[in-house]
Amino acid sequence: MKKQVVEVLVEGGKATPGPPLGPAIGPLGLNVKQVVDKINEATKEFAGMQVPVKIIVDPVTKQFEIEVGVPPTSQLIKKELGLEKGSGEPKHNIVGNLTMEQVIKIAKMKRSQMLALTLKAAAKEVIGTALSMGVTVEGKDPRIVQREIDEGVYDELFEKAEKE
């Protein structure tokens, strides 16, 4: 028998045995508490955000695995800055400022879904999203910070982050 996949959207770190999870996995004969605990462990870093989760179940052995999707980069930036939404006019209206540490943190979360081969490249993708949202980085225009990354200005931060 082939594996069954259940896809749900849960709040990071706060999944409960109630809907939508319980009714979706209960009929498969799984220990719902075990599944909920595993999902909460896997999604705790996305607290306060809706996170897509796939539960892959082998109906014969009752074994399951959890695949956690990552919220969009813009959601992660908004969470990091405590924003409701990005700027409607990013060229004229700046709504927040990210530190390089925050950029690296978001890049590490999103890296598995990005095409970027290095953490630096992933950080530059995050900075590109910040630009379109009206968010500065280190108090500067995001395009300037991208050039500084290429010039090696933040190399120490990246080396430290790669080791963590």
From Swiss-Prot:
GO cellular component: large ribosomal subunit
Keywords for this protein: Ribonucleoprotein, Ribosomal protein, RNA-binding, rRNA-binding
InterPro entries according to UniProt: Ribosomal_uL11, Ribosomal_uL11_C, Ribosomal_uL11_C_sf, Ribosomal_uL11_CS, Ribosomal_uL11_N, Ribosomal_uL11_N_sf
GO molecular function: large ribosomal subunit rRNA binding; structural constituent of ribosome
Keyword RNA-binding: yes
Pfam hit, one: Ribosomal_L11_N
Biological process per Gene Ontology, one example term: translation
Coiled coil: none
PROSITE patterns assigned: RIBOSOMAL_L11
Subunit structure: Part of the ribosomal stalk of the 50S ribosomal subunit. Interacts with L10 and the large rRNA to form the base of the stalk. L10 forms an elongated spine to which L12 dimers bind in a sequential fashion forming a multimeric L10(L12)X complex.
Similarity annotation: Belongs to the universal ribosomal protein uL11 family.
Function: Forms part of the ribosomal stalk which helps the ribosome interact with GTP-bound translation factors.
HAMAP family, alphabetized: Ribosomal_uL11
Name this protein carries in UniProt: Large ribosomal subunit protein uL11
Organism per entry: Pyrococcus horikoshii (strain ATCC 700860 / DSM 12428 / JCM 9974 / NBRC 100139 / OT-3)
Encoding gene per record: rpl11
